[in-house]
Amino acid sequence: IIAAGNKIASKPYKYGGGHARWNDSGYDCSGSVSYALHGAGLLRRPLTSGDFMSWGAPGRGRHVTIYAHPGHVYMVINGRRFDTTGRDESGSRWQARSRSTAGYVVRHPPGL
C-alpha cells in the first residue's frame, strides 16, 4: 500500500482521476485510496468515496484505517494520513497531521 501511495504522492489533484484508468495524470481522493489499495492487491477496480463506506470490515484496523463519507475518503496507515485536498491543487500526500473524523464511516481492509 505504501509503495503504491508513494508512486502517486507527487501527482496533482484531478477530479475523477484514477477512475477511468489506474495510471492517470492526477488523482482525486477515492482514486488515490483505490490506487494504493490496488497496488497491494486489495482492489480490482476503483471505488468512489461512497463505495468505501461499505468496503472492507467495520471499525479501525490494526495498521490501515479508511475514513469515508459520500464526498471524501482518506486513509491512515500506522499513524500517517494519505489524503488529498483539491483546494490548493495538491493531490495525494502523506501527512503527519490528523484531521477530524466526525461524520466519517470507519472501515479497514480485513486482517490489516
Language-model segments: residues:
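Compositionally biased, intrinsically disordered low-complexity regions enriched in proline and serine
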Residues: K14-G16, D28, A68, V105
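Active-site nucleophilic cysteine motif
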Residues: R21-A40
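Active-site nucleophile-His-acid catalytic modules used for acyl/amide transfer and hydrolysis
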Residues: I8-G26
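...with weaker cross-activation on analogous glycine-rich loops/strands in unrelated enzymes
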Residues: I2, S34-L112
